[in-house]
A protein has these predicted regions:
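Conserved nucleotide-sugar donor-binding catalytic segment
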Residues: 37-133
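Short secondary-structure transition/capping segments
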Residues: 30, 60-70, 142-146, 162-168
């Protein structure tokens, strides 16, 4: 309904609640679990932070918000079909899910319904960590070592230099 009534909104999603057997382990505060989470590039606790964010206004502001929050749950939104088609990444790389969201934001605003209408399972293959996921995808060791380079290069080319340099400390 939001997409029908607001032509500037290109995607809409509700807040998301996580569930699953791994949630308890990720939420633990013991030293071993903290080390394990860091090794898997898991720096936050899913139940403590919002996973989707409304983004309205100028592209630079929206891009900065999503870069800083570094969440890809927004991919589960309902999108305008022509916009999501234009926003897809042809050759995926680590963080290409975030790149898709950044592409979508170029075309308009991202609406979030302020209630939980969706639950997301926190498990499956990607819960083993980013390095294991990249190995599963037959990523070379060099690409794993420099896993952020393709995304950084993509941002330099696609965000525009002003937005890229403004957020340079994030990279």
């Amino acid at each position: 309904r939001v997409l029908e009534e607001n032509s500037n909104v290109v995607a809409s999603i509700s807040n998301v609640k996580y569930f699953g057997p791994n949630l308890e382990n990720i939420e633990k505060d013991d030293l071993f679990q903290k080390f394990k989470n860091i090794f898997k590039y898991r720096f936050d606790k899913p139940t403590k932070f919002k996973q989707v964010f409304p983004a309205y206004g100028l592209y630079g502001k929206k891009a900065t918000l999503y870069l800083r929050m570094d969440r890809s749950t927004g991919l589960y939104a309902v999108f305008r079909k022509p916009i999501i088609r234009k926003s897809m990444i042809v050759h995926p790389f680590a963080s290409s899910d975030l790149a898709i969201i950044l592409n979508v934001l170029k075309h308009g605003d991202f609406h979030v319904i302020d209630e939980i209408l969706m639950e997301k399972y926190i498990g499956g293959y990607s819960s083993k960590g980013i390095i294991q996921t990249l190995k599963f995808q037959n990523t070379s060791y060099l690409e794993i070592i420099f896993m952020s380079m393709p995304f950084t290069s993509w941002c330099a080319k696609n965000l525009g230099w002003k937005i890229f340099l403004k957020n340079f400390d994030w990279f």
